[in-house]
Amino acid sequence: MSIQTDDFSEQRIIAATPASANEEAIERALRPKQLDEYVGQEKIRGQLEIFITAARQRHEALDHTLLFGPPGLGKTTLAHIIAREMGVNLRQTSGPVLERAGDLAALLTNLEANDVLFIDEIHRLSPVVEEILYPALEDYQIDIMIGEGPAARSVRLDLQPFTLVGATTRAGMLTNPLRDRFGIVARLEFYTPLELTKIVTRSSALLNAPIDEDGAFEIAKRSRGTPRIANRLLRRVRDYAEVKGNGKITKAMADAALVMLDVDPVGFDLMDRKLLEAVLFKFNGGPVGLDNLAAAIGEERDTIEDVLEPYLIQQGFLQRTPRGRIATPVAYAHFGVTAPQTGPNGDLWAGQ
């Protein structure tokens, strides 16, 4: 089952990126508005509650905050919650949009005291824009050039105190000077099935879709630890329940809908299984080089590296080695195949 777009990563129903502008609008309606409504990320939530309360009591801007982690885990949601809990406005933009220094200057000069500026994909800021940002973060001042040629001169503008909330899926791509200017740094982790069950239950109530606990858990455990995927699957299961049943989402109804969508009990879709089956059955468990694997399943090597592999490796189904990709005993068990006692790399699995 796929959502038809031009980008492979967005076609998959279990993709962690938004599939369309319409989906983003639905996501906004389902987002929690306050910290006490936010499910999961207990450590981060507890820290933010303290930092926000302290900043409010001192009537100061919250320290600049960096949120990083895989897509779909709630970085944008947390940025909106921070602004709402602080009782200030939120201005939202993204790194690729800020092409010129003037673009950033226009945003910064329009901020009111203690406002939140949220920059998504902050790792994609251009060096020119990033240089303008440094004095703004440290001293609440920016230097802009007025005029051209010999008549050009630098003017320093004072800014209102503000909070920058940066979000990125690739914290390693941030420059050290930018990373060092964040007082609060938080990594968002994947959610547990129980946390996702709570999210699915809450979202179903907002969507007026009756669901029982087993039905919510069935959706949650196939959502790859990601709320965005859980909410997307919930909407598709709701459609199925309304057409094929009485509208209530039960475990059996959720299972039938997800089977129809080609999402298996661990959250794999057709492409995940195709890749693993190629390693297991076409290359005897590996090792297999990336180019050979790409040719075997008819996908680009970049798609395999950036879209398909990360979740399989993270869940322990696939391993990267210097000689190529190999299937793990977990992958063999998932497909009901006996794993060799001695793997492709000698005694890797001996005794397991």
Swiss-Prot record:
CDD domains named in the record: AAA
Entry EC number(s): 3.6.4.-
Stated family: Belongs to the RuvB family.
Primary site of residence: cytoplasm
SUPFAM superfamilies in the cross-refs: P-loop containing nucleoside triphosphate hydrolases, Winged helix' DNA-binding domain
Binding site for DNA: 301, 320, 325
Keyword Ribosomal protein in record: no
Subunit structure and binding partners: Homohexamer. Forms an RuvA(8)-RuvB(12)-Holliday junction (HJ) complex. HJ DNA is sandwiched between 2 RuvA tetramers; dsDNA enters through RuvA and exits via RuvB. An RuvB hexamer assembles on each DNA strand where it exits the tetramer. Each RuvB hexamer is contacted by two RuvA subunits (via domain III) on 2 adjacent RuvB subunits; this complex drives branch migration. In the full resolvosome a probable DNA-RuvA(4)-RuvB(12)-RuvC(2) complex forms which resolves the HJ.
Reactions this protein catalyses: ATP + H2O = ADP + phosphate + H(+)
Annotated stretches, region: Large ATPase domain (RuvB-L): 5-191
Organism in which the protein naturally occurs: Janthinobacterium sp. (strain Marseille) (Minibacterium massiliensis)
The protein's role, per its UniProt record: The RuvA-RuvB-RuvC complex processes Holliday junction (HJ) DNA during genetic recombination and DNA repair, while the RuvA-RuvB complex plays an important role in the rescue of blocked DNA replication forks via replication fork reversal (RFR). RuvA specifically binds to HJ cruciform DNA, conferring on it an open structure. The RuvB hexamer acts as an ATP-dependent pump, pulling dsDNA into and through the RuvAB complex. RuvB forms 2 homohexamers on either side of HJ DNA bound by 1 or 2 RuvA tetramers; 4 subunits per hexamer contact DNA at a time.
Compartments, record wording: Cytoplasm
Binding site for ATP: 30-31, 72, 75-77, 138-140, 181, 191, 228
Protein name per its UniProtKB record: Holliday junction branch migration complex subunit RuvB
Renumbered residue ranges of the record's region Small ATPAse domain (RuvB-S): 192-262
Region (Head domain (RuvB-H)): 265-352
Xref: HAMAP family: DNA_HJ_migration_RuvB (MF_00016)
Gene Ontology molecular function terms on file: ATP binding; ATP hydrolysis activity; four-way junction DNA binding; four-way junction helicase activity
Domain notes: Has 3 domains, the large (RuvB-L) and small ATPase (RuvB-S) domains and the C-terminal head (RuvB-H) domain. The head domain binds DNA, while the ATPase domains jointly bind ATP, ADP or are empty depending on the state of the subunit in the translocation cycle. During a single DNA translocation step the structure of each domain remains the same, but their relative positions change.
This protein's encoding gene: ruvB
A Pfam family hit: AAA_lid_4
Residues binding Mg(2+): 76
Record GO biological process: DNA recombination; DNA repair
Record keywords: ATP-binding, Cytoplasm, DNA damage, DNA recombination, DNA repair, DNA-binding, Hydrolase, Nucleotide-binding
Record GO cellular component, one term: cytoplasm
